[in-house]
Structure formats: structure tokens, C-alpha cells
Amino acid sequence: MEKLSVYMITKNEEKRLERSLEAVSKVADEIVIVDNGSTDKTEEIAKKFNAVFVYNTWKSFSAQKRYAQNLCANKWVLNVDSDEVLSDDLIKEINRLKENFTKNAYKLRVKDMYPGWKKPRLLSRTYNIVRLYHRDYMDMPDDYSNDRPVALKKNVTVGNLKAPVLHYSYIDLTQRIDKWNRYSSEFMKTAKGKKKKYSSLRLAMEFPFQFLRYYFVRRYIFCGFYGLVESMTAAYFRFVKIAKFREEEIFEREKINAEKR
């Protein structure tokens, strides 16, 4: 049977971490947690599950994930967030796979969960993303994010797991807005490094386009109140991240002009 390392990154996750670790401990031979300076009980909870708990200064989302992955002792790794819970059926599915992995990587079905939900809503959004993989067959890109998968090498075989991961990303609206704001700032830095360009037309159209995309294409329309709120806030911060990028361009030009004076 193959050994499996589970890795995650944290900061002040005492409200959600224990439920996540209770689930992953049923499949993991090793749990690695990289923390960015928690001041709550995150470390105490992690150590209840004998996790390797390491502090690392935050540079970017992808850098933190890569650092955690590279600390893993095993070749087979599972990338889980602290707000995600493996379903009972997925735990069984992964444990069966550990006896004989037939692919190089596997996509997990992630289902969003919101306050008051006992189970995922029918027709609500499900997204498939590579989270379980053999480290020899992938690269961690610099712009890695939860909705952008790891970069698989050529001729890699990918399987699909059937049972879901339950994603409890939403605590309350304040937490959600704070999270989106951090993500938009991170995007701005990544886009700046890639020398991207965004037009005024793109900026103007971003909010309405993204709202329609989230609400209808991503099926948040089936998530009731939280689906509407999530679509509005996500679309707004998609607009904000481009606005932050354009603002940074203005600041850079002002700095250059000031130096020329």
C-alpha cells in the first residue's frame, strides 16, 4: 500500500481546522501544515492530530502551497484546504486507491457548502480539480490558486474520483469580503510580475460579466441567498483586482515621472 501525505496551509483556522483534520486523518500517513502566524488555537488543534506544523512567512498563495508540498515525506500527496472536509465516501475511495494507484493524478469533486446546509444542494456548483497526485508528475505554477489546477507534465494519466469534498468556505459576510480582498491584492502582484495589460473596457465590463458568469454559468442561482451574495461579491472583487492593477500602474508612472523631475 502506498503512503500518502496530506498538506494544507493555515492562518487562524481554529473554527474550521478540526473538522477538516478529523476527515483527512483517516487517509493520511502524514499531515503537513504550513502556517502563516496564527494567533488562535490553530497549532494546538494541529498537534492533536500529530501534524507536522511549520511556520513560514507568507510570500504568495502558490509559494506557500509549494513550500508545504515540498515538506511532505511521501511521493503521493493530497492537497486539502482547512475549510474542506473529505466526505465519508471519499475517504473510502481514497483508501481503496492507496492499495493500487492506477493513474498519476486524480481530480476531486469539490462541492460548496453554506451556513444551514446539511448536504450539497441539487444542481449547485461542482468543480473538478487535481488535488491528489504523484509529485513526479506535476509542477506547482507561480500563479497556482484554488480554481487553477497544478500543472501536469506531458503524458500524465488523470483519473476522476466520484465522492465529493465538502467546501465550507463561508463563515460570514465579513470573513468572505476580507478573503476576496486578500485574493484581489495577490492577483494584482502576480499580474504585475507577468506584465499583463487590462483595458478600460475590460474594467467596465468585468463586474456585469462576472456576475452573470457566477450566478448562471457556475449555477449559484441554485444556492438561494448565499448564491446571490457570493455572485455579487465575487464579481465585485474580480472588478477590484483589475482596478488595483490599473491603480498600481498609475502609481508606477507617477514614481517614474517624479524621478525624472
Label the predicted regions.
Residues 27, 49-50, 128, 154:
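Short, structured coil segments at secondary-structure junctions
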Residues 29, 43-71:
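Conserved donor nucleotide-binding strand/loop of the catalytic core
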